[in-house]
Structure formats: structure tokens, C-alpha cells
UniProtKB/Swiss-Prot annotation:
Gene that encodes it: THR1
Pathway linked to the protein: Amino-acid biosynthesis; L-threonine biosynthesis; L-threonine from L-aspartate: step 4/5
UniProt-listed Enzyme Commission number(s): 2.7.1.39
GO biological processes: threonine biosynthetic process
Reactions mediated catalytically: L-homoserine + ATP = O-phospho-L-homoserine + ADP + H(+)
Molecular function terms, GO-annotated: ATP binding; homoserine kinase activity
Protein name: Homoserine kinase
A Pfam family matched in the record: GHMP_kinases_C
Enzyme class: transferase
Stated role: Commits homoserine to the threonine biosynthesis pathway by catalyzing its O-phosphorylation.
UniProt keywords, alphabetically: Amino-acid biosynthesis, ATP-binding, Kinase, Nucleotide-binding, Threonine biosynthesis, Transferase
Source organism per UniProt: Cryptococcus neoformans var. grubii serotype A (strain H99 / ATCC 208821 / CBS 10515 / FGSC 9487)
InterPro entries recorded: GHMP_kinase_C_dom, GHMP_kinase_C_sf, GHMP_kinase_N_dom, GHMP_knse_ATP-bd_CS, Homoserine_kinase, Ribosomal_Su5_D2-typ_SF, Ribsml_uS5_D2-typ_fold_subgr
Lineage: superkingdom: Eukaryota
Family: Belongs to the GHMP kinase family. Homoserine kinase subfamily.
Length: 357
């Protein structure tokens, strides 16, 4: 009997979309994909998976199964379901299109890929709601991982948990995904914490078919922790109302066809995170203030993608001209960038059996 082969596909994501801080996310058409080979005969096979990693930032990815995020998350899912080891002889070929540390959900994609990998290797057939629970134990903001798993344009939140469930969900990440020591063996870390059921809830919004996303990514990384570190501990009522009003309008406006540029542009305004991140990204103030639907026909709105430094511009046409203007402003600040015009990934993550007959 031949080895079984499966493909796991996880899209990149952009979170916040202006006023939807820690709430909204969209899945986009760059991806992390895995081809997983599971041998039919395991006698004499290597006990740990072999990892082959290609694509963007592949030089920065550890290939030890006890260090690689994909396999650490997969092992967490397996052990939380009573399976203590990987199936022997597994090969994982990862191909990455998502730049690291640029605000396009690279870590969220890796977490979702790891959860799906664990589900596949354990033959668990977990429902998507349970897969999301496992992902949220690792990546504790729901916007990116929910969009990556479900696809499309989503809004999500973490529900209020009972004291018992809150205790489980608040377990430090170091206990969920421990740093395996060099001498870690098969018996190390066998009893990980169980995620509560139904940690995250979400809804899919509509998305007008005309809208594409232009992602302009500076060639430097911005750690999410650093980008969060500049945010204040509290906000004024005025600023919170500003964001809530715009978020309520934006989630409907992006579904209307044809899109209304003036409505969407104003509705993508934000006072919760972007003003505080201006100093971290040279050129950001000018980009957010000078590109408008009037100056650049086709533009609908512009925002930071996640924590940045990528700029996300939503548009219906004139994509290259919009991207070139953002690139020019970054160039004035001596910042090199790359840009891509992306479609919305409505399907989200999936696993396919690609075994040859």
C-alpha cells in the first residue's frame, strides 16, 4: 500500500482593517502550504517527522520537530487528545509565501497549519470550532487565526469564560508550548493543558467582489510585542465611540456592490492603534493622510495591516498606481518595500488527500 499524501493550505491574513482592532480579519491569497507524507509501513521508520521548509524566510525556521512551531503545535493537539507521539516516518514539506513579522499573519498561519497537522496525524476529525479552540490556546488574539481558519472577512471575539475555563485558557504559553530541552524524549511534556470548549466566536461578513487588497510590505520586521507596547492602557470615550461608529458602518459597507469609496475611506479611520504606531513606521503618517479616493481613483481605504509594518490598501482598480505612490512615500524615507495585489481567500484553510491512485 503506498504512502498517503495530504496537502494543508492556510492563507495569510490582515487584521484590524482600520477601526476593528483585535476584532476583524480578512484572509488573503498568499499562503503557507504543507505536503504531508505518511508511510503505510512504519517499521524501521524515523520516530520524528522530517521537516523540509522552502519559500520566504526559510533560513530562519528551525527544522527540529521539538523547535519548529508547526510540529510543536501539532504535538500539543496530539497529546491533548491522548496521542503521545508522532506517527513514525512522516515527512512535512512546507512552502511559505507569507513574510515573517510584517503584519500578514505569518505566526497565525503557522499555528493553524500546526493545528490541522495534529488533527491529520492523529486522525482526529475535530470540528472547526474545536480546531479554533486549540489555535486560541497558542495565538490568543482571535482576529488572525479565525480569518485564516474560516476564510473571508470575519469578526471575532473571546467569550466570557467560567472561572474554571478562564484558569485553563490563561495558562502561560510556555506551558502550552513548552521549550523542549535538547535531551527531550518521547516522555517529556505528555500532559498539556486542555483548551476550554468554545473559546472564540465569530461571524463572517460579506465582501464585494470588486474589492482587492494591495499589500505594501517594508523590508523590515516589526515585532507584534513592540507594536503593542506603544499602545496606551486606556482610551477616552470619544476615541472609543469614534472607532465603534466606523466599525459598525465598515462591516456593511465592504459588502455593498458597487463599493462607496467616500463611505469606506472615512469608515476605515482609527484612533485606537494606528496613531500610536506612527513612530515605528517611517512614512506612515503621510501615507494615511495623503492617499484618498480623490487623489487616487479606485482607492477605497488604507490602513495598517495588523501591527504593521505592511500597509493595506483596499481598491477596485488602479492597483499599481496606488501601490507605486505608497512605495514612493516609503522611498522618501529610505525604506525599501515589496507589494502584491491580493484577492480575498473565501475558502480559508483546508486539507486535501493528494495520494496518487
Amino acid at each position: 500500500m503506498p504512502a498517503r499524501k495530504y496537502k494543508i493550505h492556510v492563507p495569510c491574513t490582515s487584521a484590524n482593517i482600520g477601526p476593528g482592532f483585535d476584532v476583524c480579519g480578512i484572509a488573503l491569497s498568499l499562503s503557507l502550504s504543507l505536503v504531508v507524507t505518511i508511510p503505510s509501513v512504519s517499521s524501521g521508520a524515523e520516530p520524528l517527522p522530517k521537516i523540509i521548509y522552502t519559500g520566504l524566510d526559510s533560513d530562519n525556521v528551525p527544522l527540529s520537530p521539538y523547535k519548529n512551531l508547526l510540529t510543536r503545535v501539532a504535538l500539543y493537539v496530539l497529546r491533548a487528545n491522548g496521542i503521545t507521539t508522532f506517527p513514525p516516518g512522516v515527512t512535512i514539506e512546507a512552502r511559505n509565501e507569507i513574510p515573517f513579522g510584517r503584519g500578514l499573519g505569518s505566526s497565525g498561519a503557522a499555528v493553524i497549519a500546526g493545528v490541522l497537522l495534529g488533527d491529520l496525524l492523529g486522525n482526529l476529525s475535530l470540528p472547526k470550532s474545536r480546531l479554533l479552540d486549540f489555535a486560541l490556546m497558542v495565538e490568543r488574539h482571535p482576529d488572525n487565526v479565525t480569518a485564516a481558519l474560516m476564510g473571508g472577512f470575519v469578526g471575532s471575539y473571546l467569550r466570557e469564560l467560567s472561572p474554571e475555563d478562564m484558569s485553563a485558557a490563561s495558562i502561560p504559553l510556555a506551558e502550552v508550548l513548552p521549550e523542549y530541552p535538547p535531551d527531550a524524549g518521547p516522555d517529556w511534556g505528555k500532559s498539556p493543558p486542555q483548551p476550554p470548549h468554545g473559546i472564540g466566536h465569530f461571524v463572517r461578513f460579506g465582501w464585494a467582489k470588486e474589492i482587492k487588497a494591495i499589500a505594501v510590505s517594508p523590508r523590515f520586521e516589526l515585532a507584534t510585542a513592540k507594536a503593542r507596547g506603544v499602545l496606551p492602557e486606556s482610551y477616552s470615550r470619544k476615541d472609543m465611540i469614534f472607532n465603534l461608529q466606523r466599525l459598525a458602518v465598515l462591516t456593511t459597507a465592504l459588502a455593498r456592490s458597487p463599493p462607496d469609496p467616500d463611505l469606506i475611506y472615512d469608515a476605515m479611520g482609527d484612533r485606537v492603534h494606528q496613531p500610536y504606531r506612527m513612530t515605528l513606521i517611517p512614512g506612515l503618517p503621510k501615507i494615511l493622510s495623503t492617499l484618498t479616493p480623490t487623489s487616487h481613483p479606485g482607492l477605497l481605504g488604507i490602513c495598517l495591516s495588523g501591527a504593521g509594518p505592511t500597509i493595506l490598501a483596499l481598491a477596485t482598480h488602479n492597483f499599481e498606481a496606488i501601490a507605486n505612490e505608497i512605495e514612493r512615500i516609503f522611498g522618501d524615507e529610505q525604506v525599501l518595500v515589496d507589494h502584491k495585489v491580493l484577492n480575498i481567500d473565501e475558502k480559508g484553510s483546508w486539507v486535501e488527500d493528494i495520494t496518487e491512485a
